[in-house]
From Swiss-Prot:
Catalyses which reaction(s): Release of an N-terminal pyroglutamyl group from a polypeptide, the second amino acid generally not being Pro
Enzyme class: hydrolase
Gene: pcp
Catalytic residues (UniProt): 78, 141, 165
Keyword Cytoplasm: yes
Subunit annotation: Homotetramer.
Source organism (scientific name): Levilactobacillus brevis (strain ATCC 367 / BCRC 12310 / CIP 105137 / JCM 1170 / LMG 11437 / NCIMB 947 / NCTC 947) (Lactobacillus brevis)
Role noted for this protein: Removes 5-oxoproline from various penultimate amino acid residues except L-proline.
Taxonomic lineage: Bacteria, Bacillati, Bacillota, Bacilli, Lactobacillales
This protein's name: Pyrrolidone-carboxylate peptidase
Keyword Oxidoreductase: no
Length: 204
């Protein structure tokens, strides 16, 4: 079994993004499955093409995308992606769509194929906060989740895909009083637990 794990580059003026930093530190194999890390740009459209090319090259069984959700206090596997781009800030290419469909002829939403409740439980069993989320937002995180699901629907039917949000790192909240954070070590531990849950479910 092979998993493609994607993480976004820094955006919104941040110097770091816990998503790619955690993804880069994942073990090469988890529960006997191969883990392939991939950095993707925080850019509408382009991020999906980068992932598509990686799917063609790597032929993964699962794509799990990881993104930063500043303000959240837990690792949150996402249940659903909606067909809407509505950027609160411009992406890293300066593009800021407002109320635009991601795929004009696509469905209103896609549900993940990943075992989100088992993932959240595994993260909690690792001693970290986690719960299933029903909103991936309307920025590039939701965009990539939707786009990978659309790729599954149109090109790669055997693929399973999903998304998980992780909190800010401690160094990102130094000037943000009261905003929660999680250490990079804990991010890696939580993601590893979530991936193990995916592998176990895939084997059943």
């Amino acid at each position: 079994m092979k998993l493609l794990i994607t993480g976004f580059d820094p955006f919104g003026g941040e110097k770091t993004n816990p998503a790619i930093e955690a993804v880069k530190r994942l073990p090469a194999a988890i529960a006997g499955a191969t883990v392939v890390p991939l950095e993707i740009p925080t850019v509408f459209g382009t991020c999906a093409e980068v992932v598509r090319q990686a799917i063609i090259t790597e032929r993964p069984d699962v794509v799990l995308s990881v993104g930063q959700a500043g303000g959240r206090s837990a690792l949150t596997p996402e249940r659903i992606a909606i067909n809407l781009d509505d950027g609160r800030i411009p992406d890293n290419a300066g593009f800021q769509p407002v109320d635009q469909p991601i795929q004009p002829n696509g469905p209103a939403a896609y549900f993940t194929q990943l075992p989100v409740k088992a993932m959240a439980q595994a993260i909690r069993q690792a001693g970290l906060p986690s719960h299933v989320s029903t909103t991936a937002g309307t920025y590039v995180c939701n965009h990539i989740m939707y786009q990978v699901q659309h790729l599954r629907a149109t090109e790669f039917p055997q693929l399973q895909a999903g998304f998980i949000h992780i909190p800010f790192l401690p160094e990102q909240v130094v000037q943000r009083s009261g905003v929660p954070s999680l250490s990079l070590t804990d991010d890696v531990r939580g993601l590893t637990a979530a991936i193990r849950a995916i592998v176990i479910a895939h084997a059943d």
